[in-house]
Amino acid sequence: SDCQVSNIQVMQNFDRSRYTGRWYAVAKKDPVGLFLLDNVVAQFSVDGSGKVTATAQGRVIILNNWEMCANMFGTFEDTPDPAKFKMRYWGAAAYLQSGNDDHWVIDTDYDNYAIHYSCREVDLDGTCLDGYSFIFSRHPTGLRPEDQKIVTDKKKELCFLGKYRRVSHTGFCESS
């Protein structure tokens, strides 16, 4: 891979209805700035007109030391590529971030794993200057061994290999 954002391959023939439901983030590559720390669970839905929406929650620390469960919302705008969306997102509370990000589905088998990618800022040389990525699993316990290799190959293609951190699931957001 030459690390050019414009050359990144996304999921072919992406099926949004099979992508719906609950996904547990098992690893993430952080962007610059405030971001969900762990206990990240995303839920994707498709309405009657085919529009994609999502909710996500995860643990954050704000004001330096206040730990809380953040509830985030997103609406997805279609692009000519079915696996590439423009996502408008906001938090349930005013001090949580809001904005617009790309939301690309790089690969998924719909039943076990999914790889998400978002570049917030492309550098002058065409590589990603500020971006983030989630590795999702349908299972809170993590990826199956047979999915690990696929995911590692995709991390390389995204030029994010070695930049991911494990996302733990401790039940923090279920209790709060």
Curated annotation (Swiss-Prot):
Q: Locate the N-acetylserine modifications and list their residues.
A: S1
Gene Ontology MF terms:
retinol binding; retinol transmembrane transporter activity
Q: Which Pfam families match?
A: Lipocalin (PF00061)
Q: Does the keyword Transport apply?
A: yes
> Which residues are recorded as binding substrate?
Q97
Q: Where does the protein end up?
A: Secreted
Source species, domain of life: Eukaryota
Ordered alphabetically, the record's keywords are: Acetylation, Disulfide bond, Retinol-binding, Secreted, Transport
Q: Which cysteines are joined by disulfide bonds?
A: C3-C159, C69-C173, C119-C128
Q: Per the record, GO CC terms?
A: extracellular space; yolk
Main location (coarse class): secreted
**Which family, according to the similarity comment?**
Belongs to the calycin superfamily. Lipocalin family.
Q: Which function does this protein serve?
A: RBP delivers retinol from the liver stores to the peripheral tissues. In plasma, the RBP-retinol complex interacts with transthyretin, this prevents its loss by filtration through the kidney glomeruli.
The name on file for this protein is Retinol-binding protein 4-B
User: Origin organism of this chain?
Assistant: Oncorhynchus mykiss (Rainbow trout)
Phylogenetic placement of the source organism? Eukaryota, Metazoa, Chordata, Craniata, Vertebrata
Name of the coding gene = rbp4b
